[in-house]
Amino acid sequence: MLILSIGLIHHTSNKSLYTISPNKGKRYEPFTTTSLGNFQFHVVRFLHRLIYGTQRYQELFPPIQKIKNINNVKQQRIFPVNCAADDLDLGFGESDQIELFNHPSKDTYGQFNLIQLIDIFDPPQVHAPSSADEFFKSNKGSEHIDIFDMITRQPPPFHQHQLNIETPYFEDFATPLVLPPHEVSSDDVESYFSGSVSTVSSIEPLDDEFVPPPQPPRTHTSRKRKHDSISPPASSDSSSSSSYVPQLIPSSSSSVTSNGDSPVSPTTKRKYTKKKQPVFSNVDEPIVITTTTKTNNIDVKKITTTKNGTVENRFDCPSCDASFKVKGYLTRHLKKHSTSKAFECPFFDNHGVHGSKCHPTGGFSRRDTFKVHLRALHFIYPAGVKASQRNSFNGRCAGCFQYFDNNSEWLENHIEAGKCTGTVQYKQNVSNLLLD
């Protein structure tokens, strides 16, 4: 007899074996069997029974034909769906766009007519008795003013009348109440603004919001748009003043007096022209004279230029393109091209047998450049010494490795004295003695 694990197999006969016992207290119940050939292996069913404790194993892996809507609309309809437009006071017209204002042809809001709410208020006790009340009473017969009609009056949607909009949407309440000018007097307006508001009415703080006060008449002063010089003359005859057409009179004067508010006429603007530079026809042309002179027995070209009374000299080098204003500078420069040098490096060897090719020619025409060459290439300094600190450090001679306190002592007492045993001349003399 074999004892098998729970739930991995089940019998293929009519009576199936289940892992869950009818008793809820026993979740797993082992069983014994002797016929293994009548059982089949169902792992998915076992996993669902083990996890969920139910035989409805198709809930996790349902067949495709049982899925009615993949979008799971059933779960979405359980709870109400909130919309951001629910919190706004929006109107919906015939178009598919959300309108900021109600349709102008509809007078209802929320299926209720707003004119029915007028019974809540007490119109007779709005303001204290004043002369402005007579003004409103006089206008009742001419035109019926509906307060709530003015409040709910809104411009048409933008997509319908976007070309006929004269004022912005949100300035509806800012527009003053327009009344016939012949029925309004200045005394009525002043008494309206100076009148005290009654304390009996329950809607006193909101009076100015529902009923905008009449605006006092404005006296617009005409601005002067034209220059004083071109303004028409004053005339008592209305026909002559209306038929007068101002004409621009060109003025030859450059300065025009005008008021601060009136712009300057385009014809009276000052025109600035660039002053032309005077052209002098008697300008001296440069005179160039070329001569030849000698320096160090070398013929050089001298170019003399005379311009506006000044004389300039230029000396050109015959070996290169260099030119100098001073003859002495050219004389010093010509030493570079001379084959015979006044100073020669004692460690230079063109073939590199007894020395090194430390310079293109090994010769120097100037003493200062000769010393700079020796101190830079033929004196050994300690490691890390900068070029500006070479004169204050000790070192050794690169030819014979003799020690010296500084490079000046090495140059004067060792190189110029001819005591170095590492020069090319000393090595050639030693080799000649050995060959003999």
From Swiss-Prot:
Zinc finger (C2H2-type): 315-337
Topology class, membrane: Peripheral membrane protein
Record's compositionally biased regions (Basic residues): 268-277
Localization of this protein: Cell membrane; Nucleus
Record has Amino-acid biosynthesis as a keyword: no
Biological process (GO), any one: positive regulation of transcription by RNA polymerase II
PTM annotation: Activated by the amino acid-induced proteolytic removal of an N-terminal inhibitory domain.
GO molecular function, one term: DNA-binding transcription factor activity
GO cellular component: cytoplasm; nucleus; plasma membrane
Composition-biased stretches (Low complexity): 230-265
Pfam families cross-referenced by the UniProt entry: zf-C2H2
Role summary: Transcription factor that activates genes required for degradation of extracellular protein and uptake of peptides such as the secreted aspartyl protease SAP2 or the oligopeptide transporter OPT1. Required for virulence. Synthesized as latent cytoplasmic precursor, which, upon a signal initiated by the plasma membrane SPS amino acid sensor system (including CSY1 and CSH3), becomes proteolytically activated and relocates to the nucleus, where it induces the expression of SPS-sensor-regulated genes.
Protein name as catalogued: Transcriptional regulator STP3
Organism (species): Candida albicans (strain SC5314 / ATCC MYA-2876) (Yeast)
Recorded name of the encoding gene: STP3
